[in-house]
C-alpha cells in the first residue's frame, strides 16, 4: 500500500511542495527567506485577526481602540507590537529575498519573478493602508501626502484622489475603506504566494552557482525542513527581542498623538521600509516626475531579466558585478537614511545623487560590467 501522503488529493499537494520536493543540495541560508516570508504572512494574518476583533475603524474611536487593545485586552499589547514589528520583519525578509534573487540571477524564472514583483507591490500597499489605521498624526498625514501624489496624474488626478478619499479630505470614509483593504489584501497575498510557489516548482529552485542542479537533487524533508525551522526560530527570536525590549524602536513618536487635520507634523515620513522610495520621490523637484520615479524604482525589477547581459547566471563567479551589487545595497541604505532626514542643504543633494546612482547602476552599469566580464573571460 502506498503512503497516504502520496495518494490523498490534498496531502499529495503538500507532499509535492514541502516533503518529497527535489531540491538542490547546495542552496545556502539565503534560500531560507521564502519560507520565512510565509511564516511572517501567517503571523501577520493571525495577529491581525485578533487585533481586528477589538479595533474600530471610525475616526472618533480608532485611536482609542488601539489604546484599549494595549491597555485592557488580555495580551493585547504583545499582539499589537508583534503585528507592528512583524511588518518590519516581513520587509527585512522581503528585501533580502529580492536581493538574493538579484545576486544569484533567480529573475531568469520569468513567471516566478514577475509574480514576486506583483507580491512586493501588494505587500507595500497592505503596509501603507495598515499604517493609517491607528489614526495617529503620522497615520493621517502619511495617508494625506501619499494619496495626494495621485493628483499628479494629468486630467483625472484630482477626481481620482477624491474618489479614493471618499470626500474632500482624508476622513471617516477613508479610514473605513483602508481597514477593508487592509483586511482583504493579506488573503490576496496568500493566494499570489501559492501561485508564486506553483511557478517556482515548475522549474525547481535556483542554486548559488546558477548551474542547473538536476543531476544532484535531495528531498526537501528532512534536510530543508530542519534548515527552515532553524531560520524560523531565529526570525521569532529577533522579532520577540524587538517586541519585548524595544517595541517602538522602528515606529514614529508622532503616531502616539491622535490625528489632527489642523496641525501638520514638522517632518512627515513613512515607516522605515518605504524611506528609500520616499527619498527617490523627494529628490525630483516636480510632482509628476517624483511619482513616476517612485513607481519606476520598484517597477524596474521587472526589467532585470531584460538587462541581464552576462553569460553566467549567478554573480558568484563575477567579482566586478559583486562589487556593483554591494554598491547598490549601500546606495539603498543611503536612500533609506536620506528619506528619514529633513529636506535641507546636505541631504537634498545626497538624495539626488543617490537616486541617480540607483537607476544608473541597474540600467547602465550592471549590463555594462556584465559585458566587460564576458570579454575578460574571452567568451
Curated annotation (Swiss-Prot):
Main location group: mitochondrion
Topology relative to the membrane: Multi-pass membrane protein
Keyword Mitochondrion: yes
GO terms for cellular component: mitochondrial inner membrane; respiratory chain complex III
InterPro entries in alphabetical order: Cyt_b/b6_C, Cyt_b/b6_C_sf, Cyt_b/b6_N, Cytb/b6-like_sf, Cytochrome_b, Cytochrome_b_C_euk/bac, Cytochrome_b_N_euk/bac, Di-haem_cyt_TM
Cofactor details (free text): Binds 2 heme b groups non-covalently.
Pfam annotation, one family: Cytochrom_B_C
Keyword Heme attributed: yes
Keywords: Electron transport, Heme, Iron, Membrane, Metal-binding, Mitochondrion, Mitochondrion inner membrane, Respiratory chain, Transmembrane, Transmembrane helix, Transport, Ubiquinone
Compartment(s) where it occurs, according to its Swiss-Prot or TrEMBL record: Mitochondrion inner membrane
Ligand binding (heme b b562): 83, 182
Gene3D superfamilies given in the database record: Cytochrome Bc1 Complex, Chain C (1.20.810.10)
GO MF annotations, alphabetized: metal ion binding; ubiquinol-cytochrome-c reductase activity
Transmembrane intervals: 33-53, 77-98, 113-133, 178-198, 226-246, 288-308, 320-340, 347-367
Cofactor(s) the protein needs: heme b
Description of how the protein assembles with itself and partners: The cytochrome bc1 complex contains 11 subunits: 3 respiratory subunits (MT-CYB, CYC1 and UQCRFS1), 2 core proteins (UQCRC1 and UQCRC2) and 6 low-molecular weight proteins (UQCRH/QCR6, UQCRB/QCR7, UQCRQ/QCR8, UQCR10/QCR9, UQCR11/QCR10 and a cleavage product of UQCRFS1). This cytochrome bc1 complex then forms a dimer.
Additional free-text comment from the UniProt record: Heme 1 (or BL or b562) is low-potential and absorbs at about 562 nm, and heme 2 (or BH or b566) is high-potential and absorbs at about 566 nm.
PANTHER family, alphabetized: CYTOCHROME B
Protein's job: Component of the ubiquinol-cytochrome c reductase complex (complex III or cytochrome b-c1 complex) that is part of the mitochondrial respiratory chain. The b-c1 complex mediates electron transfer from ubiquinol to cytochrome c. Contributes to the generation of a proton gradient across the mitochondrial membrane that is then used for ATP synthesis.
This protein's name: Cytochrome b
Amino acid at each position: 500500500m502506498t503512503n497516504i501522503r502520496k495518494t490523498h488529493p490534498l496531502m499529495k499537494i503538500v507532499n509535492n511542495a514541502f516533503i518529497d520536493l527535489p531540491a538542490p543540495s547546495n542552496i545556502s541560508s539565503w534560500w531560507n527567506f521564502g519560507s520565512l516570508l510565509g511564516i511572517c504572512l501567517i503571523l501577520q494574518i493571525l495577529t491581525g485577526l485578533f487585533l481586528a476583533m477589538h479595533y474600530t475603524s471610525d475616526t472618533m474611536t480608532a485611536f482609542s481602540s488601539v489604546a484599549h487593545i494595549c491597555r485592557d485586552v488580555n495580551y493585547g499589547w504583545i499582539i499589537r507590537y508583534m503585528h507592528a514589528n512583524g511588518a518590519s520583519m516581513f520587509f527585512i525578509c522581503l528585501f533580502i529575498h529580492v536581493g538574493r534573487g538579484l545576486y544569484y540571477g533567480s529573475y531568469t524564472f520569468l513567471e516566478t519573478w514577475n509574480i514576486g514583483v506583483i507580491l512586493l507591490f501588494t505587500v507595500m500597499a497592505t503596509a501603507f493602508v495598515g499604517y493609517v489605521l491607528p489614526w495617529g498624526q503620522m497615520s493621517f498625514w502619511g495617508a494625506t501626502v501619499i494619496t495626494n501624489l495621485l493628483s499628479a496624474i494629468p486630467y483625472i488626478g484630482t477626481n481620482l484622489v477624491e474618489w479614493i478619499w471618499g470626500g474632500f479630505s482624508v476622513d471617516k470614509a477613508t479610514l473605513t475603506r483602508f481597514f477593508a483593504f487592509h483586511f482583504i489584501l493579506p488573503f490576496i497575498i496568500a493566494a499570489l504566494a501559492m501561485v508564486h510557489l506553483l511557478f517556482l516548482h515548475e522549474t525547481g529552485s535556483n542554486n548559488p552557482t546558477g548551474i542547473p542542479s538536476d543531476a544532484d537533487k535531495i528531498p526537501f524533508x528532512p534536510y530543508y525542513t530542519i534548515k527552515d525551522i532553524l531560520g524560523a526560530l531565529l526570525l521569532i527570536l529577533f522579532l520577540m527581542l524587538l517586541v519585548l525590549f524595544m517595541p517602538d524602536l522602528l515606529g514614529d513618536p508622532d503616531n502616539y498623538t491622535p490625528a489632527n487635520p489642523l496641525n501638520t507634523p514638522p517632518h512627515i515620513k513613512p515607516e522605515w521600509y518605504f524611506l528609500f522610495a520616499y527619498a527617490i520621490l523627494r529628490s525630483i523637484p516636480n510632482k509628476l516626475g517624483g511619482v513616476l520615479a517612485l513607481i519606476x524604482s520598484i517597477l524596474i525589477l521587472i526589467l532585470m531579466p531584460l538587462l541581464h547581459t552576462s553569460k553566467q547566471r549567478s554573480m558568484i563567479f563575477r567579482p566586478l558585478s559583486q562589487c556593483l551589487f554591494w554598491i547598490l545595497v549601500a546606495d539603498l541604505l543611503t536612500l533609506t537614511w536620506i528619506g528619514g532626514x529633513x529636506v535641507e542643504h546636505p541631504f537634498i543633494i545626497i538624495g539626488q545623487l543617490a537616486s541617480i546612482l540607483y537607476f544608473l547602476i541597474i540600467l547602465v552599469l550592471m549590463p555594462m560590467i556584465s559585458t566587460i566580464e564576458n570579454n575578460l573571460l574571452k567568451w
